[in-house]
Amino acid sequence: MNIRPLGDRVVVKMVETEETTKSGIVLPGSAKEKPQVAEVVAVGPGTVVDGKEVKMEVKVGDKVIISKYAGTEVKFDGQEYTILRQNDILAVVE
C-alpha cells in the first residue's frame, strides 16, 4: 500500500541528523529542535489556481528544506511521514 497525496500536497520523510553542541555533547532526541530537512517520498498531481495549472516543482527523492512547523505528521506502515503543501517547501537541497 502506498500514500498518494492529492492536489499540491507532498509526502516527506524527515531526515534525522545527530545534533552535537560546540563542546561535543550529543543532544538526545527530546532536546533537539524539529528537523527541517526531509526527503520527498510522494508528490501529488498539482492543482489549479485561478484557472491556471500549478505544476509540482519537486520530485520523489529530492531533499528539501521545509517550514519548521509545516504539515501534518502521520504514521503509516510503522514509518513516520509529514504531509504538507508545496508552498511549505522552502528550498530543494542540491
Curated annotation (Swiss-Prot):
BP GO annotations: chaperone cofactor-dependent protein refolding
UniProt GO MF annotations: ATP binding; metal ion binding; protein folding chaperone; protein-folding chaperone binding; unfolded protein binding
A Pfam family of this chain: Cpn10
Location(s), subcellular: Cytoplasm
Key words of the record: Chaperone, Cytoplasm
GO CC annotations on file: cytoplasm
InterPro entries in UniProt: Chaperonin_GroES, Chaperonin_GroES_sf, Chaprnonin_Cpn10_CS, GroES-like_sf
Superkingdom of source: Bacteria
Record function comment: Together with the chaperonin GroEL, plays an essential role in assisting protein folding. The GroEL-GroES system forms a nano-cage that allows encapsulation of the non-native substrate proteins and provides a physical environment optimized to promote and accelerate protein folding. GroES binds to the apical surface of the GroEL ring, thereby capping the opening of the GroEL channel.
Family stated for the protein in its record: Belongs to the GroES chaperonin family.
Subunit structure of this chain's protein: Heptamer of 7 subunits arranged in a ring. Interacts with the chaperonin GroEL.
Name under which the protein is recorded: Co-chaperonin GroES
Organism per entry: Acetivibrio thermocellus (strain ATCC 27405 / DSM 1237 / JCM 9322 / NBRC 103400 / NCIMB 10682 / NRRL B-4536 / VPI 7372)
Name of the gene encoding the protein in the UniProt record: groES
